Design a protein with these regions (language model features):
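N-terminal non-globular leader segments, chiefly Sec-dependent signal peptides
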Residues: 20-23, 34
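Positively charged, low-complexity intrinsically disordered regions
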Residues: 22, 39, 54, 81-82
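Enriched for short, Lys/Arg-rich terminal
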Residues: 2-11, 15, 56-59, 64-85
Length: 85
């Protein structure tokens, strides 16, 4: 499985503190080793329907999953109180 970051997510990632970046990097490595990326995520609803979120500490990764390409694209990374705004 491949995990990619959208430009916005890359910028958000680089703004995070180093320990949080390492937490997210460790999660991405685990995610790449999974057969089913939906097993640890949660489907989003309403205006974010069709996207998935992953919880990494107090941060959330909003992603799109493309089954035919076996690709997870990270669209947005933010603190849990800000991620859905």
């Amino acid at each position: 499985m491949t995990v990619e970051f959208a430009e916005k997510a890359k910028k958000e990632f680089l703004k995070l503190d180093t320990p949080i970046q390492k937490q997210i990097q460790n999660f991405i490595v685990k995610l790449q080793g999974m057969k089913n990326p939906r097993s640890t995520g949660k489907a989003l609803v309403r205006n974010l329907a069709g996207r998935w979120r992953y919880r990494v500490g107090d941060y959330r990764l909003v992603c799109e999953i493309e089954d035919e390409k076996i690709l997870v694209t990270v669209l947005h990374i933010a603190h849990r109180r800000e991620v859905y705004k």
